[in-house]
Amino acid sequence: MLFRSEEIIIPYLSPVDGRWHRYFPDFYVKVRNRQGLIESRILEVKPKSQSVPPKVRGKVTRQYLKEVAAWGVNEAKWKAAEEYCKDRNWKFNVITEEQLGI
């Protein structure tokens, strides 16, 4: 097993400002899967509230607009990470407190 933290850099285009930025995923791991094969994965750990699009709750507030912007940036990062992984035959996962059991 191999474990690295925030060592991979993935470029992504931000929908908020239309500029290119660098995304540093939380973890890169190499593990042996159930079939005994070595598998590479990029893992991002986020609160569940940041891993789903925000819901409109009545009046549009500044907080809601911040949540929409954060969701847009996260979605752009994750799409870039999925492409990065696809090109290398790796897997990309967003992990929340649900998967961690907390």
Regions found by a protein language model. Give the residues of each.
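Electrostatic, structured charged patches in enzyme active sites and in nucleic-acid/phosphate-binding
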Residues: M1-I102
